[in-house]
Amino acid sequence: MAYLLVFVGGGLGAMFRHFINTLSGRLLGTAFPYHTFFINVTGSIVMGLIAGYLAFKGGSSQHFRLFLMTGILGGYTTFSAFSLDAALLYERGAVGLAVVYVLGSVVLAIAGLFGGMALIRAMT
């Protein structure tokens, strides 16, 4: 049952990620990997919100956590795409953009996680 929950959640997360990828490409262009940047930051914020809620409120089942955190968020976020995008920027000669992308993604994702946890902590 656990594998099925992760499988279904992962499919949903991947579908939403694909939606964000295509939408950002249409709206913002493809010169900078806005799609992966947005996905990594928002995924970390949501993970922080969920982790904070579960840590302070508890009460959710392992199946729920597997479906939501491992499945949906695991399918939605990815640092393998992050690494590829950074390498592609570098390979294209956009070294400055690559540095901004890597530093911005890491700093904002970690800040988003702490922010999500702090928000839940303040609400409980």
From Swiss-Prot:
Q: What is its main location?
A: membrane
InterPro entries of this UniProt entry? FluC
**Which positions are annotated as binding Na(+)?**
G74, T77
Please provide the record's keywords in A-Z order: Cell inner membrane, Cell membrane, Ion channel, Ion transport, Membrane, Metal-binding, Sodium, Transmembrane, Transmembrane helix, Transport
As recorded in UniProt, coiled-coil segments are none
Q: Which GO terms describe its cellular component?
A: plasma membrane
GO terms, molecular function: fluoride channel activity; metal ion binding
Q: Protein name, please?
A: Fluoride-specific ion channel FluC
Q: Which domain of life is it from?
A: Bacteria
The regions listed as transmembrane in this protein's record are 1-21, 36-56, 66-86, 94-114
Q: What is the regulatory mechanism acting on its activity? A: Na(+) is not transported, but it plays an essential structural role and its presence is essential for fluoride channel function.
Question: Which reaction is recorded as catalysed by this protein?
Answer: fluoride(in) = fluoride(out)
Q: Name one GO biological process term.
A: cellular detoxification of fluoride
Function per UniProt: Fluoride-specific ion channel. Important for reducing fluoride concentration in the cell, thus reducing its toxicity.
Q: Which organism encodes this protein?
A: Rhodopseudomonas palustris (strain ATCC BAA-98 / CGA009)
> What topology does the record note for this protein and the membrane?
Multi-pass membrane protein
What protein family does this chain belong to? Belongs to the fluoride channel Fluc/FEX (TC 1.A.43) family.
